[in-house]
């Protein structure tokens, strides 16, 4: 027979986080925000279809760099960097990350979560895990379709580029995790988190990366770009240009920095959720 102490014991953080994850994942997948962001993820697929059609109509339509016509694998690498890592992943991380707690406050449902005898930080951790899975499910079909549409252009081999494709998926996962963790902390700690996220994604990161110096190290994109040349063919003109005109951090440093941003961001977000008093506006 369970004792009264057993019945009143607080659930552990991990058990609570898993339960919150199960409840939140379905809500995120079927939310209006996910429908809009799924359409955003469909944009690269439409672009890839246009590129494939142009290549079928005439190879001369494909872009060139220094007189060298770009093949499908290089075009795919550029799309991963310019469309996914520099735009779609930060936007998804910003919209989902800042809303993990803010949506509960705006909907005045946060009280129902916090009056229960569960660790507050577990609510944030569970919602963050749901964000990661939801975002991965939104992006993965888009990336796979773009891969099959673009890579065969110019005689590219799907089998030969598959290891690089796995590296691209790893970069996307690192970006989803790190941006989400950063914006989860912003959403849990600060007011007007979406405004701050917009300034960071569309103002701070693009602006700082254009100038030499140490400020670019205070961006996530700087460490993500350190992984990009290693996912692209090393003998391609685009890879040479990336290495020549941009300062690339070592791969080990990039992985350590992205992992640190993820772990510290989730920890600080959970701590902020535990300590902050949320005032519901009437």
Enumerate the language-model features and the residues they cover.
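Hydrophobic/aromatic residues in alpha-helical transmembrane segments
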Residues: 93-97, 110, 145, 179-182, ...
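Alpha-helical transmembrane segments and their helix-start/interface "positive-inside/aromatic belt" motifs
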Residues: 25-41, 131, 192-198
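Membrane-interacting alpha-helical segments
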Residues: 14-29, 163, 167, 221, ...
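Terminal transmembrane helical anchor/hairpin motif
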Residues: 3, 51-76, 189, 194-275
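Secretory targeting signals
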Residues: 42-99, 124-189, 194, 209, ...
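Short cytosolic juxtamembrane segments of multi-pass membrane proteins
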Residues: 275-282
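Aromatic- and glycine-rich beta-strand/loop motifs that create alpha-glucan
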Residues: 2-38
